[in-house]
Amino acid sequence: MSFRINTNIAALTSHAVGVQNNRDLSSSLEKLSSGLRINKAADDSSGMAIADSLRSQSANLGQAIRNANDAIGMVQTADKAMDEQIKILDTIKTKAVQAAQDGQTLESRRALQSDIQRLLEELDNIANTTSFNGQQMLSGSFSNKEFQIGAYSNATVKASIGSTSSDKIGHVRMETSSFSGAGMLASAAAQNLTEVGLNFKQVNGVNDYKIETVRISTSAGTGIGALSEIINRFSNTLGVRASYNVMATGGTPVQSGTVRELTINGVEIGTVNDVHKNDADGRLTNAINSVKDRTGVEASLDIQGRINLHSIDGRAISVHAASASGQVFGGGNFAGISGTQHAVIGRLTLTRTDARDIIVSGVNFSHVGFHSAQGVAEYTVNLRAVRGIFDANVASAAGANANGAQAETNSQGIGAGVTSLKGAMIVMDMADSARTQLDKIRSDMGSVQMELVTTINNISVTQVNVKAAESQIRDVDFAEESANFSKYNILAQSGSFAMAQANAVQQNVLRLLQ
């Protein structure tokens, strides 16, 4: 055993161990006071890098949730505004339905039209003023907007809201077959004219649909009335509704004279003597109407005193009489009734409540006037048109003109909006079309909102899990660290005692010098 004074190895060793114990004790106190296992890079360099990445991801996810909530707020703003617009459209249609009956006078229809115009102004006002944070929502400018809903770039949801102003919604496409003139040549006593089978092309943008063949004749259950019924039976599939107007009209007012051997649709009416000018006593119309249940044809006089024969169920109209009887009828569709029998087919109107074209082909489709070379009347209107006049083009495309005589009467159009019966029908279709368009936009917005809600739910859970993962790395385990602190505290105290003892040992050398 050796004794040295200059170098107290035991004291130095105790000091070194004590310094380390104090360092560990300070680190433990720092962790306990901050609640963090990693307070500086030296504590866990790789763990710190991972924890910092997770903290950034969690913060970004939190902002993504706020972004999604902002987007939901925008969507809900637009949705509530469109809900009000749909209520306006429902009111417009209700007023159009009210106007679509001839118990209304022109003045009462004008009052309804005035109400509708005010409603349209409010509809456009909603479209032009609805905004979120200064951005127009329903004017058509809100297109392809993106919302960041993730922690990393390009994790976005896109949203677009089409324009809901009256000039962008409520489209109605109308196509009416061409005038048939005197009509088609009637064959034999059965008055069987032709058979027609229509093929509607690219109904849904891809598929064609062919409907069953219909006989066009003067018999009951035939004609464009039967064709219209079949089309309407499958209107949901075809996307098209049909209506018809079969009418024969005199070119001039009824002339005085005698109609001999009058036959309508194969039913013999006989001779009508001493018909007065303009059929003043109703003799001619009464004779025709007395057998209307058998002929399917009803007679009336228009304001000019011209005779109109109207097919009740849409069958063709064939009129035949002895020589010179056509003059009494006033010519027009009756110009050749004393010669070879002809039939008036009438006009078929197809209506689609959107802006797409109606493409028709098929078997003998030209026989009902739907060949493009025959001058099909066609027109597309939108809801804004209700503010103006439905001109002659709209009147013809909507089927308001059954023949040339009616086209002449409606040469200036059919008036503004619901001021006419046919105009009220058009406005009803416009309101339906506009509501369908708004419902589609709202449906798309609803899908976006559901996507955003689902995203919020997902990233909220992800954010919690990311925070948990960060906590596992960065936060201190107090139970574990308390145990460490107790250990380091005891070691620090025992180290101080050991250092004191090591210094005291050197004093033993003095005993050797006594």
UniProtKB/Swiss-Prot annotation:
Gene Ontology cellular-component annotations: bacterial-type flagellum; extracellular region
Entry keyword annotation includes Transcription regulation: no
InterPro entries to which the protein is assigned, alphabetical: Flagellin, Flagellin_C, Flagellin_C_sub2, Flagellin_hook_IN_motif, Flagellin_N
Result of changing A182E: In strain: 85P
SUPFAM superfamilies: Phase 1 flagellin
Outcome of swapping A335T: In strain: 85P
Keyword Secreted: yes
One Gene Ontology term of the molecular function aspect: structural molecule activity
Entry similarity comment: Belongs to the bacterial flagellin family.
Function text: Flagellin is the subunit protein which polymerizes to form the filaments of bacterial flagella. Important for motility and virulence.
Complex and partners: Heteromer of FlaA and FlaB. FlaB is located proximal to the hook while the remainder of the filament is composed of the predominant FlaA.
UniProt-recorded name of the protein: Flagellin B
Gene: flaB
